[in-house]
From Swiss-Prot:
Lipidation (N-palmitoyl cysteine): C21
Xref: CDD domains: 5TM_YidC_Alb3
Residue stretches spanning the membrane: 59-79, 129-149, 160-180, 202-222, 223-243
PANTHER family named among the record's database cross-references: CYTOCHROME C OXIDASE ASSEMBLY PROTEIN COX18, MITOCHONDRIAL, OXA1
Keyword annotations from UniProtKB, A to Z: Cell membrane, Chaperone, Lipoprotein, Membrane, Palmitate, Protein transport, Signal, Transmembrane, Transmembrane helix, Transport
Protein name as catalogued: Membrane protein insertase YidC 2
Name of the gene: yidC2
Lipid bilayer topology: Multi-pass membrane protein
Gene Ontology molecular function: membrane insertase activity
Signal peptide residues on this chain, from the entry's feature table: 1-20
Similarity-based family: Belongs to the OXA1/ALB3/YidC family. Type 2 subfamily.
Length: 255
């Protein structure tokens, strides 16, 4: 069920991206219409602008601060999602035994398997859907922030550190840092799950490569958002999964 929900989450994300692509080059203004623009993108654009004005038209610093605010706001959801994932992982040995017991693919056997799986969840107080809800809540917020960065026209007129916020980083520093921090964040997220999910192992390498390609071709403002978000995510993983990360490192060093 979780695999199906994960696939559904990916489909929803793809639909959101596809639907938003037609608007991503249109500046966000008070006159922008639609629920998406009025209640998601424009408020985040205004939040960036507010901090930029507060910091003397420093839009780079405004993106950093707004990213941190959003990440802190989403932190309780991430903690809940991680706890749910850990609870599901703890049940994996028993789940494997059930699947071996009911290995036949006929409908009656599969129904019996589903019934016993649900009983196992209830017995251990685990909700298989609890880990998916935070994903669906986070996706529109993070995607709206991406839109706010891309569609706030004032951002492209400013610089931050060594780069122009409206252009790709000419030295490729941000794209490389974004890719590396993506890899580290995912590596930490996988701590304690090695060998349990080959698809996650593949994504460990695929996601950083995708981020690198996107960051090379997108404005540096978006790369800055990725880097700050990833660094926060790394700290978040140490906060939530500290013991597992230490155990994973100890296991790796002993081999």
């Amino acid at each position: 069920m979780k695999k199906k929900l994960g696939l559904l989450a990916m489909v929803v994300a793809l639909m959101a991206i596809t639907a938003g692509c037609s608007e991503v080059n249109q500046p966000i203004t008070p006159k922008s219409t639609g629920i998406w623009n009025e209640y998601f993108v424009y408020p985040l654009s205004q939040l960036i602008t507010y901090f930029a004005n507060l910091f003397g038209s420093n839009y780079g610093l405004a993106i950093v601060v707004t990213t941190l605010i959003i990440r802190f706001a989403l932190l309780p959801l991430m903690i809940k999602q991680t706890k749910s994932t850990k609870a599901m992982q703890a049940l994996q040995p028993e789940m494997v035994k059930l699947k071996e017991k009911y290995s036949s693919k006929d409908q009656a056997t599969q129904q019996k398997l589903q019934q016993e799986m649900m009983q196992l969840y209830q017995k251990n107080g685990v909700n298989p859907l609890a880990g998916c809800l935070p994903i669906f809540v986070q996706m529109p917020i993070l995607f709206a922030f991406y839109h706010a960065i891309m569609r706030t026209s004032e951002i492209s007129k400013h610089t931050f550190l060594w780069f122009d916020l409206g252009q790709a980083d000419p030295y490729y520093i941000l794209p490389v840092v974004a890719a590396i921090t993506t890899f580290i964040q995912q590596k930490l997220a996988m701590a304690g799950t090695a060998g349990q999910n080959p698809q996650m192992a593949m994504m460990l390498w695929l996601m950083p490569i995708m981020i690198l390609i996107f960051a090379i071709n997108f404005p540096a403002a978006l790369s800055l958002y990725w880097v700050v978000g990833n660094i926060f995510g790394i700290a978040q993983m140490y906060l939530i999964k500290g013991p597992e990360i230490k155990a994973s490192k100890a296991g790796g060093s002993s081999k």
